[in-house]
Amino acid sequence: MSVIKMTDLDLAGKRVLIRADLNVPVKEGKVTSDARIRASLPTIEIALKQGARVMVTSHLGRPTEGEYNEDFSLLPVVDYLKEKLSSPVRLAKDYLDGVDVAEGELVVLENVRFNKGEKKDDEVLSKKYAALCDVFVMDAFGTAHRAQASTHGVGKFATIACAGPLLSGELEALGKALSKPARPMVAIVGGSKVSTKLTVLDSLSKIADQLIVGGGIANTFVAAQGHNVGKSLYEADLISEAKKLLETCDIPVPSDVRVASEFSETAAATLKSVTEIKDEEQILDLGDVSAERLAEILKNAKTILWNGPVGVFEFPNFRKGTEIIARAIADSDAFSIAGGGDTLAAIDLFGIADKISYISTGGGAFLEFVEGKKLPAVVMLEERAKQ
């Protein structure tokens, strides 16, 4: 994967536009989770330190395109950046016809989704973004799978289009885990539905030495082995697909689980074998024997890819399976990469972020990369590197 890297360029005096992923949760005008901004700070700081005229932009939320809406303004992000950076920071609302930026100053360009044509990768809008800068830096891995004006179109028309350190790091880490993984390679795919992750399961079954399934996905595999899953979330129409995967890949299906009579935070957990599940019960977590068996597999792994929890970890009574898995990954010597919103929430909950080799900021982009799909923004950067 050959792209121009921002870190290889001299940015002094240049107008630099960074497309970051600053799509953070905001409540009452305050940023409530700063993980994505923190991840973007090093890129901004490198450009400022080099004496560039720095602009950064992002989308935030899902406003009606082409309309300004204060609820989706990047102003809370600007307030956050003012606290973290020693350089002056300001918000520019009207910038499409040009914006003055001083050396060593950071100008945040208001939410790109307020611009008509953003989502459709409009050429006129893309050219306006490109005219703002000498160097366009794509650093938002989380939106690299979308061909939009601020992630894709702008890069086609900018004088120079390059990958920022965050995007480069994501691509290198995923490449390391998927292209030439140290073996054994173990992949964990959790979540509620097989249907949404069937392509991922299929792709990983060809790469991984062992494929661990969890959550509602695992219930479909339990059912595929002929067990009653009661009222559990599962997909009867995908049992044949699950059987196919069981034949082609080593998938350790749970032998014991934690069940409840209702889907509720206060529901009592009962530990039982998968052969004993009653019609009125639903599986909400792995059992101890299954979780410890998986922990042992992870202990011996050399590469671990983790996407999705293995139980309803948001409920304290059904957290144990995910915690055992999370701690096994943290204790492993393997190169580990984790991605997806729920996975990141679990990592935060168990306080193991510093024990994971690489935490991906992308949800959909992470999955599409794992599926082997080409990400439009990355393809654009590769094409620009050839010119």
From Swiss-Prot:
<dbReference type="GO" id="GO:0005829">
    <property type="term" value="C:cytosol"/>
</dbReference>
<keyword id="KW-0547">Nucleotide-binding</keyword>
<feature type="binding site">
    <location>
        <begin position="59"/>
        <end position="62"/>
    </location>
    <ligand>
        <name>substrate</name>
    </ligand>
</feature>
<dbReference type="GO" id="GO:0004618">
    <property type="term" value="F:phosphoglycerate kinase activity"/>
</dbReference>
<keyword id="KW-0963">Cytoplasm</keyword>
<feature type="binding site">
    <location>
        <begin position="340"/>
        <end position="343"/>
    </location>
    <ligand>
        <name>ATP</name>
    </ligand>
</feature>
<feature type="binding site">
    <location>
        <position position="36"/>
    </location>
    <ligand>
        <name>substrate</name>
    </ligand>
</feature>
<dbReference type="InterPro" id="IPR015824">
    <property type="entry name" value="Phosphoglycerate_kinase_N"/>
</dbReference>
<dbReference type="GO" id="GO:0006094">
    <property type="term" value="P:gluconeogenesis"/>
</dbReference>
<keyword id="KW-0067">ATP-binding</keyword>
<comment type="similarity">
    <text>Belongs to the phosphoglycerate kinase family.</text>
</comment>
<feature type="binding site">
    <location>
        <position position="146"/>
    </location>
    <ligand>
        <name>substrate</name>
    </ligand>
</feature>
<keyword id="KW-0808">Transferase</keyword>
<protein>
    <recommendedName>
        <fullName>Phosphoglycerate kinase</fullName>
        <ecNumber>2.7.2.3</ecNumber>
    </recommendedName>
</protein>
<dbReference type="InterPro" id="IPR001576">
    <property type="entry name" value="Phosphoglycerate_kinase"/>
</dbReference>
<feature type="binding site">
    <location>
        <begin position="21"/>
        <end position="23"/>
    </location>
    <ligand>
        <name>substrate</name>
    </ligand>
</feature>
<feature type="binding site">
    <location>
        <position position="314"/>
    </location>
    <ligand>
        <name>ATP</name>
    </ligand>
</feature>
<comment type="pathway">
    <text>Carbohydrate degradation; glycolysis; pyruvate from D-glyceraldehyde 3-phosphate: step 2/5.</text>
</comment>
<comment type="subunit">
    <text>Monomer.</text>
</comment>
<feature type="binding site">
    <location>
        <position position="113"/>
    </location>
    <ligand>
        <name>substrate</name>
    </ligand>
</feature>
<keyword id="KW-0418">Kinase</keyword>
<dbReference type="GO" id="GO:0006096">
    <property type="term" value="P:glycolytic process"/>
</dbReference>
<keyword id="KW-0324">Glycolysis</keyword>
<feature type="binding site">
    <location>
        <position position="197"/>
    </location>
    <ligand>
        <name>ATP</name>
    </ligand>
</feature>
<dbReference type="InterPro" id="IPR036043">
    <property type="entry name" value="Phosphoglycerate_kinase_sf"/>
</dbReference>
<dbReference type="Pfam" id="PF00162">
    <property type="entry name" value="PGK"/>
</dbReference>
<dbReference type="InterPro" id="IPR015911">
    <property type="entry name" value="Phosphoglycerate_kinase_CS"/>
</dbReference>
<dbReference type="GO" id="GO:0005524">
    <property type="term" value="F:ATP binding"/>
</dbReference>
<dbReference type="GO" id="GO:0043531">
    <property type="term" value="F:ADP binding"/>
</dbReference>
